[in-house]
């Protein structure tokens, strides 16, 4: 394995606010992708009371080569999860919340109704909190993502993850063009929504392939793109091809803006929900000025 460069070293999680966030998450029986995916930014984010909640349990029905979330037979849905999530948001006084999930291919709707219930419960408690959802692809789940789009979260995020050439290796049970279709249809169903997608670099893709993904996302009218370094969670996961330099990330940011994205987050430690509240405010401001 390549030795990790200095620009990828994050502070160890600690501090009073970090512990308060942890306790609130545990008290309300919630899972977070921050913990399950071993995110390097957990210390920084939780010390700002920012946590990305992972609904539909902690066990995924897929086994993507990049992801650290456990794979297996999932538990039954928790009927109290939406209410518990809303209570935690109120306790943490969140202005912006990101909700993601494991893949639930075992459910007839892929878990779409649980996303909708979470949106509804949050809106019952507060109209001040903006809601960003990061969903799986709902492959072969007719009407699933369409129903969520109609429920009107503020941001609909679905990650493209990597370039199409690497899908068979990195994301074998997903389909690149289905993900593009999802993003395009979400915008058509609810044009008021901001749409967002992200990809990892350092897996063996070329710059030209990344530029093509940018073009594909813009063709789907995606507003916001995130680009971050892939980090190998364990030796059994996909290997890192190389570490992309901060200068290259800046170049990707420049190119993405030139292609028409309203907001671009591109850095080694960028993740889908990293600085999500600040980026949402930038997104809203950029939309207003266009």
UniProtKB/Swiss-Prot annotation:
Gene3D superfamilies in UniProt: Aldolase class I
Disulfide links within the chain: none
Residue ranges of domain Radical SAM core in the record: 46-262
Catalyses which reaction(s): [[Fe-S] cluster scaffold protein carrying a second [4Fe-4S](2+) cluster] + N(6)-octanoyl-L-lysyl-[protein] + 2 oxidized [2Fe-2S]-[ferredoxin] + 2 S-adenosyl-L-methionine + 4 H(+) = [[Fe-S] cluster scaffold protein] + N(6)-[(R)-dihydrolipoyl]-L-lysyl-[protein] + 4 Fe(3+) + 2 hydrogen sulfide + 2 5'-deoxyadenosine + 2 L-methionine + 2 reduced [2Fe-2S]-[ferredoxin]
Chain sites annotated for binding [4Fe-4S] cluster 2: 60, 64, 67
Enzyme class: transferase
Cofactor or coenzyme needed: [4Fe-4S] cluster
GO molecular function, one term: metal ion binding
Compartment list: Cytoplasm
Swiss-Prot/TrEMBL keywords: 4Fe-4S, Cytoplasm, Iron, Iron-sulfur, Metal-binding, S-adenosyl-L-methionine, Transferase
Gene Ontology cellular component terms for the protein in this record: cytoplasm
Pathway(s): Protein modification; protein lipoylation via endogenous pathway; protein N(6)-(lipoyl)lysine from octanoyl-[acyl-carrier-protein]: step 2/2
Enzyme Commission number, as recorded: 2.8.1.8
The keyword Transferase is annotated on this UniProt entry: yes
Family statement: Belongs to the radical SAM superfamily. Lipoyl synthase family.
Protein name as annotated: Lipoyl synthase
Organism of origin: Wolbachia pipientis subsp. Culex pipiens (strain wPip)
